Swiss-Prot record:
EC number: 2.7.7.56
Residues bound to phosphate: 87, 125-127
PANTHER family: EXOSOME COMPLEX COMPONENT, EXOSOME COMPLEX COMPONENT RRP41
HAMAP family linked to this entry: RNase_PH
Catalytic reaction(s) noted: tRNA(n+1) + phosphate = tRNA(n) + a ribonucleoside 5'-diphosphate
Family classification: Belongs to the RNase PH family.
Function, as annotated: Phosphorolytic 3'-5' exoribonuclease that plays an important role in tRNA 3'-end maturation. Removes nucleotide residues following the 3'-CCA terminus of tRNAs; can also add nucleotides to the ends of RNA molecules by using nucleoside diphosphates as substrates, but this may not be physiologically important. Probably plays a role in initiation of 16S rRNA degradation (leading to ribosome degradation) during starvation.
Keyword annotations of the record: Nucleotidyltransferase, RNA-binding, rRNA processing, Transferase, tRNA processing, tRNA-binding
Protein name, entry field: Ribonuclease PH
Length: 239
């Protein structure tokens, strides 16, 4: 099959991570994956949720939103609806889980790190881009806190990144754009650590089924892409 921009089946879109994109957050980036653009920021709050009070542990949580003009037809702000959608809630939880898996939260002290992900332009893979970019914003924030003497060490146990994979017309492909995602027989989001361990696998078939062999192919593709993303994260962070 021929892909947009004549990408190979195992080739990601061009990814850029621009650190320090905002003035006020403790850490921020703009991540671009092809035409998808997500602004990720990290800000510290000197308290934790009630269930963690007095336990000497920190917390990492995330919020996610689509700007109205990020999509081809205007997306209504969820604030004007009075509640967030199930999709938004799912993505927020996914981002938070992915980051907490690699953070030593007792080393944070009783503080909450808020991650905000705002999609400026959506062309597929916004949740995976949000995870990949948010990790860099989180690391930058922790680095700042260590330099300021707020924490003793950078409480990060491993790197984390995410990518989409799918099957179209029987062909496994890496990093789906929206036009590909909308016609995929199988669509999957994969979150992995730098050590190659899995944090989350979200995969579904539409109107068909997929085999164990195809699942293994997809996970192999995802692992390749995620290692490339983590190499980029390390370059940006200078580690």
């Amino acid at each position: 099959m021929e892909r947009p921009q004549n990408r190979g089946n195992d080739q990601m879109r061009t990814v850029r991570i621009i650190p320090g994109f905002q003035k006020y957050p403790d850490g921020s980036v703009l991540i671009e994956a092809g035409d998808t653009r997500v602004m990720c920021s990290a800000m510290m709050e000197e308290k934790v949720p009630p269930f963690l009070r007095g336990k000497g542990s920190g917390w990492v949580t995330a919020e996610y939103s689509l700007l109205p003009s990020s999509t081809e037809t205007r997306t209504q702000r969820e604030a004007s609806k009075g509640k967030i959608s199930g999709r938004t809630s799912e993505i927020q939880r996914l981002i938070g889980r992915s980051l907490r898996a690699v953070v030593d939260m007792p080393a944070m002290g009783e503080r909450t790190l808020w991650i905000d992900c705002d999609v400026l332009q959506a062309d597929g893979g916004t949740r995976t881009a949000a995870i990949t970019g948010s990790f860099v914003a989180l690391y930058l924030a922790f680095k700042k806190f260590k330099e300021q003497g707020i924490i003793e060490t950078i409480p990060v146990k491993d790197f984390v990144a995410a990518i989409s994979v799918g099957i179209i017309d029987g062909t496994p492909i890496l990093d789906l754009e929206y036009i590909e995602d909308s016609q995929a027989d199988v669509d999957m989001n994969v979150v992995m650590t730098g050590n190659g361990d899995f944090i989350e696998i979200q995969g579904t078939a539409e109107g068909t089924v997929f085999s164990r062999a195809e699942l293994d192919q997809l996970l192999e593709l995802a692992g390749k892409g995620i290692q490339e993303l983590i190499a980029l994260q390390k370059t940006i962070l200078g580690v």
